[in-house]
Amino acid sequence: MARILIKNGRVWDGEKFFFADVLTEDKVIAKIEKNISDDADYVFDATDKTVSAGLVDIHVHMKGIASEEFGIEPQMSSFPFGVTAVNDAGSAYGDRALLDSFAVKNTVFVGVDARDNHADFTVTEELLQKYGDKAIGIKVYFDTTLTEVRDITPLKEICDYAKSKGLKVMVHCSNSPTSMAEIVNTLSAGDILTHIYHGGVNSCTENDFEAFKIAKDKGVILDAGFAGHVHTNFRNLEKSIKSGYLPDTISTDITCCSAYKRGGRYGMTMCMSMAKTVGMSEEQIFQAVTSAPAKVLGKENEWGYLKEGRCADMAVFDYTNEGFHLTDNDGNRLHSPTGYRCVLTVSDGQVIYRD
């Protein structure tokens, strides 16, 4: 296998930034140190660029695993944006063999039905069998426009079921029938609340960000789940960041509907650019797309870190005039003349994307 040397970059190893070269050999990171002199098969000059651990997207919808209306080809929606590992949120189709066939590393949160304000685990049980140990959680659409939920009852049932199975819970909370605070009070440490900056009823700003305070105390994970502009109100996002309520993880919720809008550039790099525009630091941003989601998924020993001896999953980013101009569903605008751009992605020690 080709030996890859990335020179002169600012390295993000999942915990901190520092300047060094990175050498890969036989699918692993062989060296991270300054001034590596090596006759590598492939040399990339990362001057003025960031060399990061491969990004981890905790909320995607993969073709063949998600519904036909939503699923997107996983490699095309990941590698060009520096993402080397993903978690499908709401899996309902396909099987373990299909998941294993994808080049991008993956886990899944299986779907669950809610009928007449009660959870139905019939399909969930079947999916858990089909996906095997790839299934690490349950995704709940706690949304009155999508499922038959009227109060907290079905969510309590789902949380009890998940706990009995040793699974995590991820809750889509847009258009929920209860307050965000009540949702968080029902979840356990390590469970995930996604679309936290939505602009509908029962939003994060109620009672001076009460839900976020409870989540931080309980250890419930706050996931941005930006979905471009669909599940994100830019004013709520800006207010939250200015008040110190940052997301634990940044994810795309990318689908075949969102990926090819906005010039076909929507992906993790745009989400990172949005976060930087509203005031998150680079340390906070890169942690939220590498080590933090890896830990949430229980994959911190495999994903999210750039360390010697670890799997050679990494990406190189530039911060350029690749800006964006977005309008959310409530008419609020967010724009920047600059943004992140992935210029190289390495997965399992192979160059898998080059800009």
Regions found by a protein language model. Name each.
Residues 1-52:
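Histidine-rich, glycine-flanked metal-binding segment
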Residues 9, 27, 48, 59, ...:
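Divalent metal-coordination and catalytic microenvironments
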Residues 46-102:
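Metal-associated gating/positioning segment near the N- to mid-region
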Residues 53, 76-84, 105-110, 130, ...:
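Active-site gating loops and adjacent loop-to-helix segments of metal-dependent hydrolytic enzymes
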Residues 67-77, 117-130, 177-183:
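Short, acidic/polar
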Residues 140-239, 244-261:
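Active-site core of metal-dependent hydrolases
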Residues 236-319:
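His/Asp/Glu-enriched, well-ordered alpha-helical/loop segment
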